[in-house]
Design a protein with these regions (language model features):
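Noncatalytic alpha-helical scaffold of FAD-dependent oxidoreductases
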Residues: 1-169
């Protein structure tokens, strides 16, 4: 599952919330954007994609909710390799809830809003609420070491996450 469509490539190459990025999109001033967008759905697909990227010298940029607070979605100007945006939003499941130990296992692509709603139905909370919570993903929170409005009660994301499975080159 991938796309080479211009609109998908453009969407995955900038964030949603800064006036600078909105301006650049509206006035066709983005410096560079992804060559392809891959939509991953599992850890196995992620491993295969990273292996292929290494083999063929491709630059991968992860994409979650697209909030881009850290400005990490735009390919670097000096990047000469093929750039692939890796969309994690299809990895958005709640895999398990351990009510006794107050633990939840989720996919990297689940948004804060969806996770909070699912946990609230069981009488729980995520305990993490960055300003971008409605759109941002758990994978994005972890990769950017996000802080949230409830940090004084629950801690930042590094205090909340107990176990992490991560695929790296």
């Amino acid at each position: 599952r991938f796309s080479s469509e211009h609109n998908e490539r453009l969407l995955h190459s900038h964030g949603q919330h800064s006036t600078d990025e909105v301006y650049k999109v509206l006035y066709n001033k983005l410096d560079q954007f992804a060559d392809l967008v891959f939509y991953i759905e599992s850890e196995e697909e992620t491993v295969k994609l990273i292996d292929l990227a290494q083999k063929h010298n491709v630059c991968l940029i992860p994409y979650g909710g697209g909030t881009n607070v850290t400005n990490a979605l735009r390919p670097p100007k000096e990047e000469k390799r093929m750039v692939v945006s890796v969309d994690t939003r299809r990895m958005a499941s709640v895999e398990s809830v351990d009510e006794q130990n107050l633990m939840v296992t989720v996919g990297a692509g689940i948004t804060g809003k969806v996770l909070e709603e699912k946990l609230n139905k069981r009488g729980f909370t995520v305990g993490h609420e960055p300003d971008s919570s409605e759109f941002s993903t758990v994978g994005g929170w972890i990769s950017t070491n996000a802080a949230g409005m409830k940090k004084h009660k629950y801690g930042n994301i590094e205090d909340i996450v107990q176990t992490l499975r991560m695929v790296t080159p």
